[in-house]
């Protein structure tokens, strides 16, 4: 038998095996809290924590919540919503603060309705549907983001601009070693969580950093980026500063971006490449570019 999650086919045997692994890991590592994560349509991370004794039931029935209280999820008349943990995303959380005296873990959730149908508004389910649509055309994709953010001394609430943590510039190393140490700590934590990193460096603006994640399939990368944002902000807090991914927190400094490299394959063949084309671009690549331009305004709405 197979589950009917859009965008992927997972055997029930495989799902049960993953659940058993999670339950065993929780017992062996004395994990006290499991955080179940999902996002609203604006990309804000949501979380509910469950005790280990409740997790097996959560796998079976999910966690019910009021979807009408989550941005964009449902109307009051459709408030009953269920967060279904995805055991394949299980990861032990790092202890980043001295107050962290217990071990916790996290899993991402798929949001479903009481009848078991995927929520139309859950960003993870929307992505699953698009991955399935791509697969139906014979394609699969890989995503590689370059994520930029500012480290600032504080985010003022009195209308004054934030103060960058350093005066460094592009690829600078000697910025009191504060930025390099921060990036080193962040990369260590990310890789301990199973999120591989390719590059990191100081960006153009004072206090601006960039960390590039290694490519992955779209769903894995979406989960990784949400984990990345959380970890970066927690490490910043630990170091007495704050991190912001706001596109333009400074009027007179460069913006934060997330340059995203997209690879598209048909089997083992690069679907974007045509050696006979003047620019070595296939018709698929040209159509892909046209689609991005057509939908650019909608894509930029949430950033």
Which residues fall in each region the model found?
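Glycine-rich, acidic/polar active-site loops that bind/position phosphate-bearing ligands
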Residues: 2-301
């Amino acid at each position: 038998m197979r589950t009917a999650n859009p965008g992927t086919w997972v055997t029930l045997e495989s799902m049960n095996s993953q659940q058993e692994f999670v339950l065993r890991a929780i017992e062996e590592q004395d994990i006290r809290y499991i955080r179940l994560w999902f996002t609203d349509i604006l990309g804000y991370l949501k979380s509910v924590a469950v005790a280990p004794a409740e997790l097996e039931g959560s796998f079976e029935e999910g966690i019910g919540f009021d979807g009408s209280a989550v941005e964009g999820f449902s109307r009051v008349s459709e408030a009953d919503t269920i967060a279904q943990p995805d055991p394949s995303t299980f990861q032990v959380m790092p202890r980043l603060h001295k107050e962290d005296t217990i071990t916790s873990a996290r899993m991402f959730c798929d949001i479903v309705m009481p009848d078991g149908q995927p929520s139309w508004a859950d960003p993870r389910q929307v992505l699953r549907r698009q991955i399935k649509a791509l697969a139906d055309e014979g394609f699969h994709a890989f995503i590689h983001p370059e994520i930029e953010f500012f480290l600032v001394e504080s985010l003022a609430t009195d209308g004054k601009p934030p103060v960058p943590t350093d005066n460094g510039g592009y690829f600078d190393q000697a910025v009191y070693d504060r930025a390099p140490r921060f990036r080193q700590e962040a990369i260590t934590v990310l890789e301990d969580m199973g999120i591989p990193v390719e590059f990191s460096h100081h960006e153009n603006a004072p206090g601006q950093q960039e960390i590039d994640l290694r490519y992955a399939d779209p769903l894995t990368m979406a989960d990784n980026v949400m984990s990345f944002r959380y970890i970066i902000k927690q490490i910043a807090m630990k170091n007495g500063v704050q991190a912001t991914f706001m596109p333009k927190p400074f009027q007179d400094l460069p913006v934060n971006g997330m340059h995203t490299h997209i690879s598209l394959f048909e089997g083992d063949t690069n679907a974007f490449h045509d050696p006979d084309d003047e620019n070595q671009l296939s018709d698929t690549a040209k159509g892909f570019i046209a689609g991005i331009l057509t939908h650019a305004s909608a894509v930029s709405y949430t950033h």
